[in-house]
Amino acid sequence: HTADYEAQIVLQNCFLFYPFTRKIDFRVVPWATFTEPEVARVGLTEREAREKFGKIKTIKAAFDENDRAHAEGETAGFAKIILHKKKIVGASIVGLRAGELIHEFVLAMRHNLSLADLNKAIHVYPTLSKITQAIGTKQTLENLKSPFTQKWFARYLKFWH
């Protein structure tokens, strides 16, 4: 798949001129290993991100929190994203159909979408892709616990009472 991606860009650059030429963006090339369980990844690992940026944030959702995984009887595994200043810099999935689930994170990284942007997408229920939304929901709930948000809500409630 990487060779196909590279070939597409080479062909485009051969036949088009600036500003229509493109550079290869290796940070968004996914990979998957079709083992039992499947493993898929895009971008930086947690260790690579810490080395590059220092302060990062990881958010993880387990497959045993996903109703479709329960229906399939495959609840082992997780999805994890790595954020640097709210930007998705990596994602890893271990579990059922990880190679297919990674694409939502590839798209987000390619187009600089935030986790909040991904969370706004409507996901069919019950599907394994709801694990992406579960990560977004965890981030939203964490944001609600921040001192700034709690202070804002306290002022808001005080205003209306």
Go through each PLM region and give its residues:
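Rossmann-like dinucleotide/flavin-binding elements
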Residues: 1-26, 127
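Flexible, glycine-rich terminal cap/loop adjacent to redox cofactors
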Residues: 15-18, 29, 34-45, 50-161
